[in-house]
């Protein structure tokens, strides 16, 4: 029965065609609509922040890569398909009913162009899209320069290895992909059309199929020869000897490197043998050549280096690896700036020889000892300075310094941000959440070396109003009062770490012209945002786009949105910097500062490389846990520079990038790629520069490397005997390493306060102190590292040993039992400070937090005790422990009377009065004002008095105390009823 005219294609009815067209349109909209919306929003946002040129450059680079790779891959694959199709044989299978590919062949024959072009273009576009992620390599290759340093093996400039070689490898990989795809396409096409037939006995190839497949197979092998050639250069970043060292070792240079040349020659011969199949019908020659290449790769490329490593290198590793370890040491020091030009080493005995009060440097250090721990006091800040339930502080506060009345003082600082997660009830309504509760309020700081009053007693210590920070508040309320210790002219915070935790993260500000303010400012005032930040949604098109992006129809129908409305997005300071400078790696800890009356976030940014020859690999970022629970290591780098300091204005979100390392060739490359995006170092305001801190992420990498790379002699490096270790955190049960700490210490030359990031180091697999590393943050000496090296046979205890000694002290243990009855105990930063002309002072604040008996009650930590410890001058590792409510009393216990006065001489210690204009805990959330007067600071030290006179005065004082005791007893007896 006939169903239609022979050869006539069926035609869909008009209605069916319309439905199919509409369905395909809807599918395309679903697939590409969200991406188009994202592109348009990015266009608007990058224009708002003034970095649209970055977005355009990245987009054009990626599009160029897509076009180039797609064109090459599609062209090669299409050529392969076309050649195979045009050279197909005219054959009819002996048994057509058993031909498995007959239906597919018929379908292809009906639309050969569609299949050919469709397959080629699809493969090309997919490959192009994947390759577009290599845009960084392309930009580095195009704009890369030189380092002025050559590698020790080939004599090439380092720029070749970090700018050129990755690009060459990427190009080679995509050519390899294109040729392999073309080979597979040729193979399948010839099989489909009979050029390749598989019978029960043997396979059969037509001459055209043999020639085409041989050419593509030869091209694959030829590309493999090029890959072997490039492998030679990549040996300089070999990981064969890790974790001992990174880079080419003896085996790599004397076995792998020659093996690569041998394999290059064999691969070229193998490729030639494949090309001979064009003229020779015998395929045994290319088959034998391919077998030779595989066998050579196993024997020459694998077995030979393995045997050399096992039987020649390992038995004599210390000697044969010596020159290569030396290369690794020199390259690592250069790549991470831990060489002699940046690190100053000093011998340090570890035992004090003088009283701290007699050493000018120590007088400064003791007066500035930090007692407040930013990791512990966030909840205290929140409870006492929250004001409203929807305000909060970051989980970890920050440390910075300010010069108040000519005196440099370090502060624990935080921004009172809006916390979207804390909104409750009707506050979470869309209108309230996104148009009313839009910003935070104020900058809060507390001097890091003192609290409002010393906590006395142990039974009810949490009920006392003591041990709390002395707040210097700069917010809306204090703006007009003139009581700001740190003046802030614009205290409103629209951009921050906490405020950006909303999902989705956006706030809608502004409205119709002349409309009443609606943003919550204070209990008695509303506010309308006037900053430059934000993307306009005053027109219906933009409103529709954002409604689509966040899947919220209220963008279209809300009367709160007018012609002057804007939406604030990407409000996390770190994220903003990452988006405008995707070629930078940002530090994990942005911190707020006040500059010229404005709250500004400072974000440290790094230029990094992962192919610096011979440089040790390190993890710049901590482990990352995926949503599925898989933990992977952070970004591995072999070169890092803190080349950029970025700022984000907390009010209008303005992002500014400042050059901070003129000598960094990587930054110079990126500045050529994105001209005008990074301001020169000369444009950094002095007030901003004064708040730059040495970044923690960089310091942690450098200290872990200095633990090994302070060793100069390769043989000693190989034995690891002189290595150090980062100590474990004695206050953390998670077995984490001790975090570095910011401190103000006395400068060795001037005795003036110097802001530094520091860390103790212990011996390799030992607990005794081996070194003390500090990084300068002061503008004049920024970036210089100082390493105090203790003798190798030192008995100076390290952090863990000191912690054990302090908590096992009888006074500490006995009072701890009392404190734990109704409190949780938190140990703060264990600070290690050089002191006493060769000694080390350990200081650790102890916080207590009342155990809550009611779910509705809130508790928060307070400073209760101060522990200090120093090594005994004339004992084999013995220590003195001080334990008291104040630092002054603790110091007197370990150094004798008089040292404690140094701690209060400049307003330090637990019982110091607040500075003028500083606010105590603010009501109603704050703790009430102290009920008792605070003890005055100790008087300044007078002239020296002879010891005999001191003894006589002490005896007289003792007699007077005895008389007073008897007098009090007599009074008590007289007042006792019936007495």
Swiss-Prot record:
Keywords: Cell membrane, Membrane, Transmembrane, Transmembrane helix
UniProt membrane topology term: Multi-pass membrane protein
Any single Pfam family the record assigns to this protein: UPF0182
Domain of life: Bacteria
InterPro entries on file: UPF0182
Transmembrane segments: 19-41, 63-85, 114-136, 174-196, 208-230, 261-280, 285-307
Biased composition (Pro residues): 913-946
One CC-aspect GO term: extracellular region
Region spans: Disordered: 898-948
Record's subcellular location: Cell membrane
Cysteine disulfide links: none
Family (UniProt): Belongs to the UPF0182 family.
PANTHER family (UniProt xref): UPF0182 PROTEIN SLL1060
HAMAP family (alphabetical): UPF0182
Name of this chain's protein: UPF0182 protein Rv0064
